[in-house]
């Protein structure tokens, strides 16, 4: 689902041109040994860090410049909202749902047609080449994330319940 092998292939096309940049993948699980081997096979050991899960994700986001997601499918990925809250521009495949609901194309990130590896590379390069673009999209991302704020969501729920409570029922309840 997360398609980390594709992310590593994409990174292998970018890393030689950006020796000061690092790709950090955070997680654990059954696929970790295969990913570790793939990092070595692609010669990416100097530029890829496979980190264990942490409770300090806020610190990770604060030390990041871009959030990249190569998932083939998602629900509503909280990691995208968290990344936006921390002011990170996002590059993600436009899965059938999830990222399309969070990212505004060209404003706070890039939605790449599913499987278009070269387009993903171009979007990452565009952001990596321009700190001003990262900052502009990061500010927009932070503003976009406000729609998921607890107070905003609660206001929508209250409005919905208020509407439902004053709308007469067309079917009597017995």
Language model features with spans:
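A short, well-ordered alpha-helix in the C-terminal region of glycosyltransferases
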Residues: 119, 126, 133-147, 156-159
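Short hydrophobic beta-strand element within catalytic cores of glycosyltransferases
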Residues: 89-93
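A short alpha->beta transition loop at the rim of the catalytic pocket in nucleotide-sugar-dependent
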Residues: 58, 65, 87
């Amino acid at each position: 689902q997360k398609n980390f092998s594709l992310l590593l292939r994409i990174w292998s096309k970018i890393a030689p041109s950006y020796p000061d940049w690092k790709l950090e993948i955070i997680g654990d699980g059954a696929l970790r040994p295969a990913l570790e081997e793939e990092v070595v096979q692609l010669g990416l050991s100097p530029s890829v860090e496979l980190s264990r899960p942490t409770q300090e994700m806020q610190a990770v986001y604060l030390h990041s410049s871009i959030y990249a997601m190569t998932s083939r499918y998602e629900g509503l990925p909280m990691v995208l909202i968290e990344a936006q809250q921390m002011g990170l521009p996002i590059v993600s495949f436009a899965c059938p749902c999830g990222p399309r609901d969070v990212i505004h194309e060209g404003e706070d990130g890039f939605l790449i047609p599913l499987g278009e590896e070269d387009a993903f590379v171009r979007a990452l390069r565009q952001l990596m080449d321009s700190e001003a673009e990262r900052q502009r999209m990061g500010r927009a991302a932070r503003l976009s994330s406000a729609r998921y704020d607890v107070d905003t969501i609660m206001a929508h729920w209250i409005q919905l319940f208020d509407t439902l409570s004053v709308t007469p029922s067309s079917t009597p309840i017995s």
